[in-house]
Amino acid sequence: MVPKEAARTLDALSDESAAAIGRVLPRLCRAVIEATGVEEYNVLENNGGGAHQAVAHVHFHIIPKPNRSEGLGIGWPMHPLDPANAASVAERIQAALK
């Protein structure tokens, strides 16, 4: 799915375009399920080259996951979350939203 508004990353989209994505993406996911018969899927959206964005505009991939070996595979190492650091980051995010 590609939004009508041209933007390189998700954070650069207007609130209106983001709201439109929120309305359309679930409908598109339902269509993918119906078309493929696969009920499990990943929605992927990358922002920036370091995050594996290969095309320089916001777009979403809906990737059916028919079984453990097909579809998107995610293999990043899990690390315990430091509660103090998490609280600090949450506070900074909350402040940035104001």
Residue ranges of model-derived segments:
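HIT superfamily nucleotide-processing domains
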Residues: M1-K98
